[in-house]
């Protein structure tokens, strides 16, 4: 019997679920808005809310707890600097889940989860490392060496 068990399994193992929510939390805090399935968005909401509350609490212990979950120094710094300041007057309710229709391939319910009072400029930030652009000096050095 499954009486009183909280949370959804989402059809994956526990380790996969933990990794998935880690990745989704990092993406949400970086872009401040992501699109995913409705059950995943509903399960991600308390994770994100607790992370923002950790950021508001501040201190070394809270920073280490956030880093243990996120494992991304840049996102932890954003969480404790800009997001903590943005939500210092708000007592919870830092995210919203908006239904976004159905996915074409399998008709899964889709949703947009976003931070309340989000920064529109954060949407669509580059997800990967910056590609190195060869400068004129590098090209001249390579030509001379050849």
From Swiss-Prot:
PROSITE patterns, alphabetized: RIBOSOMAL_L17
Region (Disordered), start-end ranges: 118-146
Xref: Pfam families: Ribosomal_L17
Transmembrane segments: none
GO function term, MF aspect, one: structural constituent of ribosome
Entry keyword annotation includes Ribonucleoprotein: yes
GO biological process: translation
Acidic residues bias locations: 134-146
InterPro entries linked to this entry: Ribosomal_bL17, Ribosomal_bL17_CS, Ribosomal_bL17_sf
Similarity-based family: Belongs to the bacterial ribosomal protein bL17 family.
Summary of subunit composition and partner proteins: Part of the 50S ribosomal subunit. Contacts protein L32.
Name of the protein in question: Large ribosomal subunit protein bL17
């Amino acid at each position: 019997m499954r009486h009183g068990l909280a949370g959804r399994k989402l059809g994956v193992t526990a380790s996969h679920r933990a990794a998935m929510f880690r990745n989704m939390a990092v993406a949400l805090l970086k872009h401040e808005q992501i699109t995913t399935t409705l059950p995943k968005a509903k399960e991600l909401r308390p994770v994100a809310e607790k992370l923002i509350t950790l950021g508001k609490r501040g201190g070394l212990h809270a920073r280490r707890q956030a880093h243990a979950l996120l494992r991304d120094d840049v996102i932890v710094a954003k969480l404790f600097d800009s997001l903590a300041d943005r939500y210092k007057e708000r007592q919870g309710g830092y995210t919203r889940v908006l239904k976004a229709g159905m996915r074409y391939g399998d008709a899964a319910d889709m949703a947009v989860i976003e931070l309340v009072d989000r920064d529109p400029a954060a949407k669509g930030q580059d997800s990967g490392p910056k590609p190195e652009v060869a400068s004129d000096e590098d090209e001249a050095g390579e030509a001379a060496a050849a």
